[in-house]
């Protein structure tokens, strides 16, 4: 029986780090076709196309320099050609671009294809919250799982030990995805609470922006610990309000929950850029260009989406930390006001 074909939709630092793992496993495991396609948004790097550089030198020199990709990972600039034959689609692009990508590949996929989203963020739907996996699943008519965890891309690429969480309602599919993605240094726990896993992944970036604000104005680890605790409480409250399925406290103790929150608040790009925002006064857009090679930051965008959702539901006052991040990012509120939000949080009244 032919092995299942895999396509990675996206090629930033996280997409490339996952390609390193998936390419290695697909080359060794009989249940997968060894050729893995990776859709790459074509860019010109020093007069050469990025796809040509990746396919010639097995390295994404722009987004994951210094790390060799397996030779069986093939960069493809056309997303339809990359995805057309895939049995398993791994989505790992900034969440604001997923609708356009789904429009392009809709109608070109295998009938029995399945997907897994590594995308962190939420959308606003007609009834409020719309998870990215739901957007993809409804657009493409395929079953969707999610992967979220304490996984800084550079450390995963360096093969430093970490854990992650797959949320998958179908047990057999969950085990297949685990086989595709697990290594001795990338250990996976599978749970059926898909929505909770995904909400954890989306909201932690927003909390990390708040942690970065604290760093930028010179507050210490005690303050950051308060941000993490209050942020986790708001994450749990949000999940209980908006998740259609069960929300168990145990899921927040998996890698997708408190572990991802901690690592992102200390080491992630959202924290780093938010710190620079607080220190320099430069715009988020300018800092994305300077610090992220133009890659998009998820935390501020998630704050904007949440503000719209919560305002529509009349629940803005229920999530003061989330909304304080929004006000600093989008309404020009001074960063110091974020500290006043912590001081006056309902938890302390």
UniProtKB/Swiss-Prot annotation:
Q: What class of enzyme is it?
A: oxidoreductase
Q: InterPro entries given for it?
A: 6-PGluconate_DH-like_C_sf (IPR008927), 6PGD_dom2 (IPR013328), G3P_DH_NAD-dep (IPR006168), G3P_DH_NAD-dep_C (IPR006109), G3P_DH_NAD-dep_euk (IPR017751), G3P_DH_NAD-dep_N (IPR011128), NAD(P)-bd_dom_sf (IPR036291)
Tell whether Transport is among the UniProt keywords. Answer: no
Asked if the Swiss-Prot or TrEMBL record annotates the protein with the keyword Cell division, the reply is no
Q: What is an annotated GO biological process for this record, any one? A: carbohydrate metabolic process
Quote the EC number: 1.1.1.8
Instruction: Enumerate the UniProt keywords alphabetically.
Output: Cytoplasm, NAD, Oxidoreductase, Phosphoprotein
In-chain residues carrying the UniProt-annotated modification Phosphoserine: 154
One molecular function GO term is:
glycerol-3-phosphate dehydrogenase (NAD+) activity
UniProt binding sites for substrate: 120, 269-270
User: Active-site positions, per UniProt?
Assistant: 204
Question: What are the subcellular locations of this protein?
Answer: Cytoplasm
| Record's GO cellular component terms | cytosol
Q: Which cysteines are joined by disulfide bonds?
A: none
Q: Where, in this chain's numbering, is NAD(+) bound? A: 10-15, 120, 153, 269, 296, 298
For the modification Phosphotyrosine, the affected residues are 326
In this chain, where does the modification N6-succinyllysine occur?
289
State where it is primarily located: cytoplasm
For this protein, what reaction is catalysed? sn-glycerol 3-phosphate + NAD(+) = dihydroxyacetone phosphate + NADH + H(+)
Similarity annotation: Belongs to the NAD-dependent glycerol-3-phosphate dehydrogenase family.
**Quaternary context:** Homodimer.
Q: What is this protein called?
A: Glycerol-3-phosphate dehydrogenase [NAD(+)], cytoplasmic
Q: What organism is listed for this UniProt entry?
A: Oryctolagus cuniculus
Gene field: GPD1
């Amino acid at each position: 029986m032919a092995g299942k074909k895999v396509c990675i939709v996206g090629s930033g630092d996280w997409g490339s780090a996952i390609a390193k793992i998936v390419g290695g496993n697909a080359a060794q495991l009989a249940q997968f076709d060894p050729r893995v396609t990776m859709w790459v948004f074509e860019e010109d790097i020093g007069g050469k196309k990025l796809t040509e550089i990746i396919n010639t030198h097995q390295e994404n020199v722009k987004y994951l320099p210094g790390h060799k990709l397996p030779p069986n990972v093939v960069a493809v600039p056309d997303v339809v050609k990359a995805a057309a034959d895939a049995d398993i689609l791994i989505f790992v692009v900034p969440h604001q671009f997923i609708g356009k990508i789904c429009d392009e590949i809709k109608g070109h996929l295998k009938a029995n294809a399945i997907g897994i989203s590594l995308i962190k963020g939420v959308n606003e739907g007609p009834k409020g919250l719309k998870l990215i996996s739901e957007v993809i699943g409804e657009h493409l008519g395929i079953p969707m799982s999610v992967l979220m965890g304490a996984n800084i891309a550079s450390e995963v690429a360096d093969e430093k030990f970490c854990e992650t969480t797959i949320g998958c309602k179908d047990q057999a599919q969950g085990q297949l995805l685990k086989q595709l993605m697990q290594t001795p240094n990338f250990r996976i726990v599978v749970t059926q609470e898909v929505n909770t896993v995904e909400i954890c992944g989306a909201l932690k970036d927003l909390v990390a922006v708040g942690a970065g604000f604290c760093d930028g104005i010179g507050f210490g680890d005690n303050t950051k610990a308060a941000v993490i605790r209050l942020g986790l409480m708001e994450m749990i409250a949000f999940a209980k309000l908006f998740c259609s399925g069960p929300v168990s406290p145990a899921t927040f103790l998996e890698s997708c929950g408190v572990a991802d929150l901690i690592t992102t608040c200390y080491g992630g790009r959202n924290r780093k850029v938010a710190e620079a925002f607080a220190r320099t006064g430069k715009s988020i857009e300018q800092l994305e260009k300077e610090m992220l090679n133009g890659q998009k930051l998820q935390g501020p965008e998630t704050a904007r989406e949440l503000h719209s959702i919560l305002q529509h539901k009349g629940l803005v006052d229920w999530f003061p930390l989330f909304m304080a991040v929004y006000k600093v990012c989008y309404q020009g509120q001074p960063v110091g006001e974020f500290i006043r939000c912590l001081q006056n949080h309902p938890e302390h009244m």
